From Swiss-Prot:
Pfam family, one: DUF3461
Name of this chain's protein: UPF0325 protein HCH_00487
InterPro entries the record matches: UPF0325 (IPR020911)
Domain of life: Bacteria
Family from the record: Belongs to the UPF0325 family.
Natural source organism: Hahella chejuensis (strain KCTC 2396)
HAMAP family per the UniProt record, alphabetical: UPF0325
């Protein structure tokens, strides 16, 4: 299941926490972040560059036969991303729900605190009259 990940140097796929993908010039840059272990100050990560596939596409079919250079993601990177999605999506689904609830709770707490302060200010105005 993780053959492509092992091929790019991922020794322990179960420790993968998340990943990012960006394009720079003619390369796709994949950065894999590992779960932080006890005593680690920073997350460990692995950065891998994948050259983009270069292609020429026919852009004018009206007889001029004009071609344009284009690039696309490499097939081996697609396989790696598929494996990463399988590993990270299970954890992400569970964490996302918990994070959303915590975020909503913090927001509600701020709203209630602000409303309490507003009511207290209104009470102060009434008592100073």
């Amino acid at each position: 299941m993780t053959d492509h990940l092992k091929h790019i140097g991922v020794a322990d796929p179960q420790r993968i926490e998340k990943y990012t993908l960006r394009t720079e010039a003619e390369n796709d840059i994949l950065k894999i972040y590992y779960k932080k272990e006890k005593g680690d100050l920073f997350h460990r990560s692995l950065k891998v560059k994948f050259p983009r596939l270069q292609k020429q596409l026919l852009v004018d079919s009206g007889g001029a036969k004009r071609y344009e250079n284009t690039s696309e993601i490499a097939p081996n990177l697609l396989h790696v991303l598929d494996e990463l999605d399988k590993i990270t999506s299970k954890e992400t689904e569970q964490v996302d729900v918990k994070e959303k609830i915590l975020k909503d709770l913090r927001h509600l707490e701020r709203v209630v605190n602000n409303k309490i302060k507003e009511i207290e200010r209104d009470l102060d105005k009434l008592s100073s009259r």
